[in-house]
């Protein structure tokens, strides 16, 4: 599929070496980004969470019989894109999420896709993007039709899916794995430089805001807030690893799955 986002940034290597993929989850507050992340990583559904926390998780996956080291950044932009460079300079691919029962979240997803398109144009690098309509279990309250979602995805040349983080692990897993496949497809065409890895100990130098140069005022680049990278525990291990971003201090709890990134998991 032709995309306005171009090609990903990643190193090449033997197929025996796990492909490293950084995936950023973008969207407005309440779209279900955290629920999708935890569903994919633990097969569990969360009912409560702190929307102000931003974490990056690491998981070893097998996609099409090939090993993948997948890092997932669960962003916390609230209602508008903010401090965008923390994920624009980090991710190989983006999952843009909206809730099918929220017109506002759908409109917000359009802003993220525009931001990604501008960034790809300026850097002349590629970022596979997938548009995801979440909360399909709330379809009786739907404010955004499937046709509208497909049309928006078509406008930016990205893949489109509708899922429910509440009900459906297999389809959620398929979306994350499809993001990996998109990165592979682009790397097969033209492998480029490795991505920028970030930690809380280091921040990026300030640059002229991308959106200021293009009139997209919603994204601001204040003091960069970057998330720590943590290995995601398996459900069987039931070991909690909770890391808050620079908005809060890091925490480690006793072995349990009661809380994960401020979530209650059922």
Curated annotation (Swiss-Prot):
Which branch of life, at top level?
A: Eukaryota
Residues at which GTP binds: 27-34, 74-78, 134-137
Query: CDD domains attached here?
Result: RERG_RasL11_like
One Pfam family recorded for the sequence: Ras
E.C. no: 3.6.5.2
Molecular function GO terms recorded: G protein activity; GTP binding
Per the record, what are the reactions this protein catalyses?
A: GTP + H2O = GDP + phosphate + H(+)
Q: Which InterPro entries match?
A: P-loop_NTPase (IPR027417), Ras-related_GTPase (IPR051065), Small_GTP-bd (IPR005225), Small_GTPase (IPR001806)
Which NCBIfam families does this entry report, sorted A to Z? small_GTP (TIGR00231)
UniProt lists the family membership as follows: Belongs to the small GTPase superfamily. Ras family.
Q: What is the name of this protein?
A: Ras-like protein family member 12
Q: Which organism is it from?
A: Mus musculus
């Amino acid at each position: 599929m032709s995309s306005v986002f171009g090609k990903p940034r990643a190193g090449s290597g033997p197929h025996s070496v796990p492909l490293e993929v950084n995936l950023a989850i973008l969207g407005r507050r309440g779209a279900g980004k955290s629920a999708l992340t935890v569903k994919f990583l633990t097969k569990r559904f969360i009912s409560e969470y702190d929307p102000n926390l931003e974490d990056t998780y690491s998981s070893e996956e097998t996609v099409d019989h090939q090993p993948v080291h997948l890092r997932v950044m669960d962003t916390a932009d609230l209602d508008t894109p903010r401090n965008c460079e923390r994920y624009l300079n980090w991710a190989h691919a983006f999952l843009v999420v909206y809730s099918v029962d929220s017109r506002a979240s759908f409109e917000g997803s359009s802003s993220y896709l525009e931001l990604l398109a501008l960034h790809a144009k300026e850097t002349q690098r590629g970022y596979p993007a997938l548009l995801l309509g979440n909360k399909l279990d709330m379809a009786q309250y739907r404010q955004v039709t499937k046709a509208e979602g497909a049309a928006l995805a078509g406008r930016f040349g990205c893949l489109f899916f509708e899922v429910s983080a509440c009900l459906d692990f297999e389809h959620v897993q398929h979306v994350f794995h499809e993001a990996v496949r998109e990165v592979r497809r682009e790397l097969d065409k033209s492998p480029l430089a490795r991505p920028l890895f970030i930690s809380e100990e280091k921040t990026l130098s300030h640059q002229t805001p991308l959106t200021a140069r293009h009139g997209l005022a919603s994204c601001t680049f204040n003091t960069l807030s970057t998330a720590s990278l943590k290995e995601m525990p398996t459900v069987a291990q039931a070991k909690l690893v909770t890391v808050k971003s620079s908005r809060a201090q890091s925490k480690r709890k006793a072995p349990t799955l009661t809380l994960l990134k401020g979530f209650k998991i059922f």
